[in-house]
């Protein structure tokens, strides 16, 4: 017996149904952070935003540095101490610190400078009580600018340390 031909409207309906099923299977799941509602509320209160790799402080709020400097000013130290204590108060005791530079200077020098910047933030977190073993320090040099390095304001935005509470 020969197979029956499908009516064009049924064929179209079958094709659309298959397409919908295929697309539904491709949906990206939201990141699972493993954090409580209280922890998320504290992260948001402190200025963290949810990104692909976790909760990041350093997008709308930044820890900025002067040109060729790796030392924190007193206001930045106070802000960082407040953040570290707030995180620890809700049992968030693991962070990644990513230091960055603008594009002025030698690539190797900027790499080391970005590491020193991240380490200066790590020192404040350790002083606030965060275990040293739970603080990951990365220097990314000038590889990930968030602003145009052609302007003074852009270069200033790129001299920063991002604080990330990893998604687990």
UniProtKB/Swiss-Prot annotation:
Changing residue 43 to P: Is predominantly a monomer. Shows a much higher peptidoglycan-binding affinity. Forms a stable complex with YfiR. InterPro entries: Bact_OuterMem_StrucFunc (IPR050330), OMP_bac (IPR006664), OmpA-like (IPR006665), OmpA-like_sf (IPR036737). Changing residue 55 to L: Exists as a mixture of monomer and dimer in solution. Is predominantly a dimer. Crystallizes as a dimer. Residues 1-25 form the signal peptide. It is a lipid-anchor. It is found in: Cell outer membrane. PROSITE patterns: OMPA_2 (PS51123), PROKAR_LIPOPROTEIN (PS51257). One of its GO terms (cellular component) is bacterial-type flagellum stator complex. Dimerizes via its N-terminal region. Activates the diguanylate cyclase TpbB/YfiN by sequestering YfiR at the outer membrane, which counteracts the YfiR-mediated repression of TpbB/YfiN at the inner membrane and leads to increased c-di-GMP production. May act as a sensor of envelope stress. This is Outer-membrane lipoprotein YfiB. The gene is yfiB.
